[in-house]
A protein has these predicted regions:
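Basic, polyanion-interacting recognition surfaces, primarily
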Residues: 1-112
Length: 112
């Protein structure tokens, strides 16, 4: 499945997984994730673990509350444990120390 269907108020969006920068748990809404793309941010009533199982080929767990699309990863700051995503690295996401090796290996293997 290459798309996520999102309903936002009275509109329905078909969002391509490759357009997603990252997905994180919503800071204020329980059982809701926040999906961030270049153009917009969407809230979806969904479990992060289920999204990881469905889209694990494209999205990688970087923290217990966040999945990232490594295709959009521009740089990794090892000291601050931050991933910079987006066209110019505008989006900053924290990663867990124990996930660094997995993230860096997958990122460096991309495009081979």
């Amino acid at each position: 499945m290459n798309y996520i269907i999102i309903q936002k108020e009275k509109e329905i969006f078909k969002l391509n997984i490759k357009d997603i920068y990252y997905i994180q748990m919503h800071p204020s809404k329980a059982h809701t994730v926040q999906i961030v793309t270049e153009d917009a941010s969407f809230a979806l009533f969904q479990n992060l673990s289920k999204l990881e199982k469905q889209y694990g080929e494209t999205l990688t767990r970087c923290h217990r509350n966040c999945l990232v699309n490594l295709e959009w990863l521009k740089s990794i700051d090892i000291q601050s444990k931050t991933l910079f995503l987006g066209e110019e690295g505008r989006y900053a996401v924290q990663y867990a120390r124990r996930r660094y090796r997995d993230i860096s290996q997958k990122w460096l293997k991309q495009g081979e």
